[in-house]
Amino acid sequence: MSSVTENGDVTAGKPNEEKTYKKTTSSAIKGAIQLGIGYTVGNLTSKPDRDVLMQDFYVVESVFLPSEGSNLTPAHHYPDFRFKTYAPLAFRYFRELFGIKPDDYLYSICSEPLIELSNPGASGSLFFVTSDDEFIIKTVQHKEAEFLQKLLPGYYMNLNQNPRTLLPKFYGLYCVQSGGINIRIVVMNNVLPRALKMNFTYDLKGSTYKRRASRKEREKSNPTFKDLDFLQDMHEGLYFDSETHSALMKTLQRDCRVLESFKIMDYSLLLGIHVLNSNVREKEGESSQNASDGKRPGGQKVLYSTAMESIQGPGKSGDSVVTETTNTMGGIPAKSHKGEKLLLFMGIIDILQSYRLMKKLEHSWKALVYDGDTVSVHRPSFYADRFLKFMNTRVFKKVQALRSSPSKKRCNSITALKATSQEIVSAVSQEWKDEKHSIITEGQSYSSLDEEVLGSRRRPDLVPSTPSLFEAASLATTVSSSSLNVDERYQRDQTMLYSSSKELPSSSTFTLEDSAIYLTSEQSTLETENDNASVLDVYL
């Protein structure tokens, strides 16, 4: 039988045997949780709503539930136990803030048996999830529960200012006392939905010291990998559109500063990656439908509970990376370096660790043996900075240009048309050079040709100019035909010049694929190869 000691150590037992935590079976713990929460939340509904006061954060209510029952409590087949509720009015406010009604809260936790999860970390805690996937119930140590109590006033203030956060959302703190043993539990939001298979799950701290999943962890059906595993598997990171990346990093930065202000460290980002694949989706769609049928009440939805809502809110879908119509189930659309379409589910976990004396000592001796900047235990400010840097540079990356903006498209079209115009001008110059060579052989000078055609002497002190960016941009918007025409006035002058020797064509037409460029001789911009060549203007 698997067991967990007072210090959180897990003792391996035979397969299929029920786990125990502090000498109490998991079934007894689950039953006590459901009975205790059912009584306290139901009793709380009779109390009138009012503003939360400072003393409300330190209130502890207690009720005794004997196995034979009492005037206030039902009979049950578990050992006698006492159930404590910490700050009931404050947590009622938190639940209301996230849109959780008392009936929905009771339905999720008490209507169906709680589902026990395999331990995803090394904390030795037991994890239960409600049948509708809304809530996670986790056992915590005495110091963690005590720290959460002290954290509540600041936590209350932060949630009031910003309910959209990746920090854990605490909905209740309770304690089961039985046989002289205290089992403290906390109810939180569920970060990873069971309805979707997580192809990869990572626990990321931004540290490299011993941050690789153990062999035992890798043998699990759903292993949780660590930082070094991520750098090996996803060495190019995960890619988001610009808006989603900005919202995600702003949320992480704000959350880290909140944790730093409370001197909290050693937290992690729990990251679940679901690879979107048509074959996988079809199979998972059937299984998730079977798993959820009849177990979730219509209309219940915890506000700000999904990863996408936590960073952006319901008004922004951020689905430019995943272009096809997909039910994201609250996941954040992203792409891998291989171009795979992904849904990401994430949340910051394990925040009930303050930088106390033991942590300072732990970092000190680790820093003597290893690089102090690589170990996970560090002072809160440095830990937050390293965590953010790792997330921004190694994990989450921005797709540079999923969709070209109008200004970029205009610049690209101008560049392409300029290059095309250079080729056209070169061809026209070569043709006119041949024509002029014929004129020279018949005795007509270039200087007179320049005077008649251009109406002025050549100016060696003038440097040929190229179109300005403003001219090019304005000309690009006037493109409407698909041919190149030589100005009629210039043709008329040429006809008069060459009437005695050689007749010029009435027009010269050059076909482009997408655009047209008009060349005239009255505006000087581009010069041909010869010093005496005519000066041309390029209009887009």
Swiss-Prot record:
Residues 1-23 are annotated as: Disordered. It comes from the Eukaryota. Its EC number is 2.7.1.68. Gene3D superfamilies: 2-Layer Sandwich, Phosphatidylinositol Phosphate Kinase II Beta. It catalyses: a 1,2-diacyl-sn-glycero-3-phospho-(1D-myo-inositol 4-phosphate) + ATP = a 1,2-diacyl-sn-glycero-3-phospho-(1D-myo-inositol-4,5-bisphosphate) + ADP + H(+); 1-octadecanoyl-2-(5Z,8Z,11Z,14Z)-eicosatetraenoyl-sn-glycero-3-phospho-1D-myo-inositol 4-phosphate + ATP = 1-octadecanoyl-2-(5Z,8Z,11Z,14Z)-eicosatetraenoyl-sn-glycero-3-phospho-1D-myo-inositol 4,5-bisphosphate + ADP + H(+); 1-octadecanoyl-2-(9Z)-octadecenoyl-sn-glycero-3-phospho-1D-myo-inositol 4-phosphate + ATP = 1-octadecanoyl-2-(9Z)-octadecenoyl-sn-glycero-3-phospho-1D-myo-inositol 4,5-bisphosphate + ADP + H(+); 1-octadecanoyl-2-(9Z)-octadecenoyl-sn-glycero-3-phospho-1D-myo-inositol + ATP = 1-octadecanoyl-2-(9Z)-octadecenoyl-sn-glycero-3-phospho-1D-myo-inositol 5-phosphate + ADP + H(+). It comes from Gallus gallus (Chicken). SUPFAM superfamilies: SAICAR synthase-like (SSF56104). InterPro entries: PInositol-4-P-4/5-kinase_C_sf, PInositol-4-P-4/5-kinase_core, PInositol-4-P-5-kinase_N, PInositol-4/5-P-5/4-kinase. GO terms for biological process: phosphatidylinositol phosphate biosynthetic process. One of its GO terms (molecular function) is ATP binding. CDD domains: PIPKc_PIP5K1B. It is found in: Cytoplasm, Cytosol; Cell membrane; Endomembrane system. GO terms for cellular component: cytosol; endomembrane system; plasma membrane. Its main location: cytoplasm. The keyword rRNA processing does not apply. The keyword Lipid metabolism applies. This is Phosphatidylinositol 4-phosphate 5-kinase type-1 beta. Residues 25-395 form the PIPK domain. Catalyzes the phosphorylation of phosphatidylinositol 4-phosphate (PtdIns(4)P/PI4P) to form phosphatidylinositol 4,5-bisphosphate (PtdIns(4,5)P2/PIP2), a lipid second messenger that regulates several cellular processes such as signal transduction, vesicle trafficking, actin cytoskeleton dynamics, cell adhesion, and cell motility. PtdIns(4,5)P2 can directly act as a second messenger or can be utilized as a precursor to generate other second messengers: inositol 1,4,5-trisphosphate (IP3), diacylglycerol (DAG) or phosphatidylinositol-3,4,5-trisphosphate (PtdIns(3,4,5)P3/PIP3). Keywords: ATP-binding, Cell membrane, Cytoplasm, Kinase, Lipid metabolism, Membrane, Nucleotide-binding, Transferase.
